[in-house]
């Protein structure tokens, strides 16, 4: 028997559909989110789950390491009040706590990460600012994308293919 392919999808700011959800909203979701319906029909959904932290940044390393924020050390969220390089902001350090990327890679899986990371500061920097990979209006900067792929900033966390910068 061959081992299964796995796709893990993490999203921000969602909740389970409430029991009182009306028919119109359910119909809209089914019509406009067909890929989500496909994954729900063909995958595994966890109906009773809890986050390790109400803040998104500490929750991500908890999901990826299986450890509480007090163990992996990421307990705060960066933003306007605290930037990535603030001495009060602690990120997960490579090799400190293994992630599911490390475990799956060790088991022979090809591990890829796409989207918001917010587990460590992974942006490539130039002149003190993150290297942009697009102009914001849809124009992609291929050389910047390649720079992220070549740098492989999530490699030590067990993932490849990530292209920044963080939103």
What are these regions (language model features)?
Residues 1-167:
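Formylglycine-dependent sulfatase
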